[in-house]
């Protein structure tokens, strides 16, 4: 808006930006609906009364986070995952131009993580809301973010498009990975390779070898894998876990030398 934040009144600031923190808030005798309705504070009069329009926005916000069924529940008695969804609904209820979220996927199961990311994506694309999120799950950041900022322990900052910033080498360096690997393309983590002389050869391919590779890793059995084309979906996991991977270049027939 071309103005300093310090020039905003508290209500102007609240209409512009909403925040969702991981810190738990303590409430007494407040339903989930009451907590969400707090997001309408910047728009209410001196007495804080909600209009019919406000009530509609509260219901829409609850519906957006799939929380209408717990709207009348005591906020202090719901689970951490439900609490996170209610706090997001409160932020949505403010109708902000900017929303800042601190690890919003904490305490959420996979279904509600996906739903939350869908909501944030919709807010950014359809409602033109600037969404700023702090995440430890880089695999989620890679899928949803237009731009990412990585901050290392030494304070070094990397900023840019996910496909430019999230590389295997950079992530290994950023997190100091020494026990295992992270595959940026698939957003998957593999534990360290089993040590010792390989006693097993796994003939996989087309996804048939992945679960066997991981089971052998859990059992601590070193193994070889192949013959895999370099574009086979088994290849990244085999490369991370196998002592040796016998490969062939993609789109080429398996040659005699490979055997």
Question: What are the language-model segments listed below?
Answer:
Residues 114-127:
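Helical segment within the ABC ATPase nucleotide-binding domain
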Residues 95:
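Conserved catalytic motifs of ABC-family nucleotide-binding domains
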Residues 1-12:
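ABC ATPase NBD Q-loop/coupling interface
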Residues 37, 52-72:
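Conserved ABC ATPase "signature" region
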Residues 175-257:
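ABC ATPase nucleotide-binding domains
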Residues 48-49, 74-78, 82:
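Conserved ABC ATPase signature
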Residues 99-103:
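Catalytic Walker B motif of ABC-type/P-loop ATPase nucleotide-binding domains
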């Amino acid at each position: 808006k071309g103005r300093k934040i310090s020039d905003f009144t508290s209500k102007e600031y609240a209409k512009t930006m909403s925040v969702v923190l991981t810190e738990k808030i303590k409430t007494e005798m407040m339903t989930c609906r009451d907590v969400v309705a707090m997001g309408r504070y910047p728009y209410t009069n001196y007495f804080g009364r909600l209009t019919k329009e406000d009530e509609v926005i509260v219901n829409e916000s609850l519906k957006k986070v799939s929380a209408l069924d717990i709207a009348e529940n005591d906020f202090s008695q719901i689970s951490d995952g439900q609490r996170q969804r209610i706090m997001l609904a409160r932020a949505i209820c403010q109708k902000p131009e900017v929303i800042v979220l601190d690890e919003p996927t904490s305490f959420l199961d996979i279904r509600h993580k996906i739903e939350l990311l869908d909501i944030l994506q919709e807010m950014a694309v359809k409602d033109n809301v600037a969404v700023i999120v702090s995440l430890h799950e880089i695999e989620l950041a890679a899928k949803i973010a237009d731009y990412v900022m990585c901050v290392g322990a030494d304070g070094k900052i990397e900023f840019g498009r996910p496909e430019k910033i999230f590389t295997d080498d950079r992530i290994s360096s950023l997190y100091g990975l020494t026990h295992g690997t992270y595959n940026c393309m698939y957003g998957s983590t593999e534990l360290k390779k089993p040590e010792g002389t390989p006693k097993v050869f796994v003939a996989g391919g087309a996804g048939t070898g992945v679960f066997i590779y991981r089971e052998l890793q859990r059992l601590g059995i070193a193994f070889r894998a192949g013959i895999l084309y370099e574009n086979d979906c088994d290849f990244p996991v085999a490369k991370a876990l196998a002592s040796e991977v016998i490969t062939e270049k993609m789109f080429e027939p398996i040659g005699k030398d490979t055997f």
